[in-house]
C-alpha cells in the first residue's frame, strides 16, 4: 500500500505544471459598474471554458474606488507552457471576442495599456507567501 501511495504522489507531482501568478489592472467607467457586475455574475459558459482551455485558473476580478475613479484588479494563475500562444488562442476565440466587444468599452485602460493597444496593464508581483 505504501508503494502505491508513493507512486501516486510522484505521478501527481511529476504531472503538475509550474504556476505563474498574474495581477492586472484597468479602469472602469462609473456608469458601467452595474452592467459589468451583472455580466460577470452570469459569465458566458464559452468564455469560462476558453479560460480553462488556455491554462488559466483561480481567476478573480476585484473593484476598487480610489478618489473618484474606479479600478478593476484581476488575479489569475497560469499553468501552461506558452503564455503568449495560449493568449493568442483565447483572442482568436469568437465567443471571447464577442465578450470583449461588450466589456472593453466599459473599461478605461491605463496610459501604458493604451500605448500597447491593450485594455489591461500587468502589475509587478512584490510579495507572495
Predicted regions located by residue number:
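A generic structural motif
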Residues: 70-74
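Short amphipathic alpha-helical segments
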Residues: 32-57
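Short beta-strand micro-motifs enriched in acidic
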Residues: 62-66
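Sec-dependent signal peptide recognition
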Residues: 1-7
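An amphipathic, aromatic/His-enriched active-site/gating alpha helix that lines ligand/cofactor pockets
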Residues: 50-57, 77-119
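Terminal, regulation- and interaction-focused segments at domain boundaries
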Residues: 19-33
Amino acid at each position: 500500500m505504501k508503494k502505491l501511495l508513493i507512486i501516486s504522489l510522484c505521478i501527481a507531482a511529476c504531472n503538475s505544471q509550474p504556476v505563474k501568478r498574474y495581477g492586472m489592472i484597468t479602469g472602469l467607467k462609473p456608469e458601467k459598474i452595474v452592467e459589468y457586475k451583472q455580466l460577470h455574475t452570469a459569465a458566458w459558459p464559452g468564455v469560462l471554458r476558453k479560460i480553462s482551455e488556455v491554462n488559466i485558473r483561480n481567476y478573480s476580478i476585484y473593484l476598487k474606488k480610489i478618489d473618484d475613479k474606479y479600478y478593476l484588479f484581476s488575479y489569475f494563475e497560469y499553468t501552461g507552457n506558452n503564455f503568449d500562444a495560449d493568449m493568442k488562442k483565447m483572442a482568436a476565440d469568437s465567443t471571447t471576442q464577442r465578450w470583449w466587444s461588450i466589456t472593453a468599452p466599459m473599461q478605461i485602460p491605463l496610459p501604458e495599456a493604451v500605448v500597447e493597444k491593450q485594455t489591461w496593464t500587468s502589475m509587478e508581483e512584490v510579495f507572495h507567501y
